[in-house]
Every structure is written in structure tokens, then in C-alpha cells.
Amino acid sequence: MDEERMERGARDILSGVRDHGREEDGARCTPSYAQGGIMDEKRIERGVREVLAGIGEGCLNAEVLANTPRRVAAMYAEFFEAMEGDPADALAVVYQEAYEEMIVMKDIPFFSICEHHLLPFVGKADVVYVPKEGRIVGASKLARVVDVAAGRPQLQERLTSQIADALVKRLDPHGVLVRIEASHLCMTLRGVKKPGATMVTSAIRGRFYKDEAARAEAFALIA
């Protein structure tokens, strides 16, 4: 097995997917939806060929070598079809309603791809917000904002913050609370190999950050 060749292939795959949230030095950079980037499927195919060659072409049949790169590129194109979208755009249609109490959408299923190993992480998201001046969105839009934010190589921590920030950007609510619980295949299949372990992250904005009682009520509603 040629790990250096596999690493070169992985770099090509990531370059084909394009920038998704970090610069070389680890500093946060402009997300791809603000850069207008496009996915380069041919470069992804080239990277997959390198990975397969690094694994060992002698172990793989001709059909795999000929067609798997194309299939993997198409899979990533499907996984990351929302990557060029701003999550806040999922909340573009705003309604006016005389309601300023908590709105809760819980147990929103999602999957995303961990940017460290390009393996899935799967879980559920809970979204809570308190409208300001009656600005609300349709229930399905809360699920959609999760899907758009998840539809790119991600870290769970960043995903949680991006969902919360999208609601703040579009609705300017009194408060937002997002909680995500997910299991990561990079912990299940490799490394520590701990199937069943889950990670929980939260993002808290506005009233929920300042008001302990409101925060406790929100967490109780999504428990």
C-alpha cells in the first residue's frame, strides 16, 4: 500500500470539492458560497484514481479501476449539492405573525461529511428561536437550513454555529439555540473504534445566552 500516493489523491479530492471553511494555517476563511466556487468532478476522479492506485491496483478489477472514480465523483456531487448555498437563504421567505414565544423544531435528522477523514457523521439537530417583531419562517425551512449547512465537508462544531448564525442573519430573533447530537464514522471505523459514542454540541445566541431561565426552558423542551 502506497500511503503517499493515497495522500496525493486525497488532496486532489479535497481540491476538487473546493474550499469549505478553513485556510492552510487553520484560520477561518470565507465559505465557498461567498466565493462562488464550483465543484471540479474531474479532479475528484483523478484523486480517486490515485487513492485506488495507492491501495494497490493488483487488488482491484478492471471495472472498479475504470468506473469507481466516476461513481465517487458523482456521489460527492450529490452529497455536496448544497455547498454553494448560503444556509441563511433557506430562510428567505419570512412571515409576520403576532407571536414572540419559543418555537422549537426538534429531532431533525441529517448527515454530513467530516472534513478530516471524508467519512459521514449522522445525527439529529434541535433548533429553538424566539421571534422578534413577529418574524417567523415555515417549519420546513428549519429542516432545510440544517440540510444546506450540512451539505458540505464539515465539523460538527462549525455546523452547529452556522445553523444558529443563519437564523440570526435572516430573522434577527430575540434568541437562538441549536443543539446537535451525532455519531461519527471516523470514530466507529478507525482510530479509537468506539461505535455508539455520540458527540453533543450547542450554539446559543441572544436571549438564551443571557437568560439562564430561558436557556433552561429551551433545553428542557428539546430533552
What are these regions (language model features)?
Residues D2-G16, M39-A223:
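A domain-level signal for the structural core that forms small-molecule/cofactor-binding pockets
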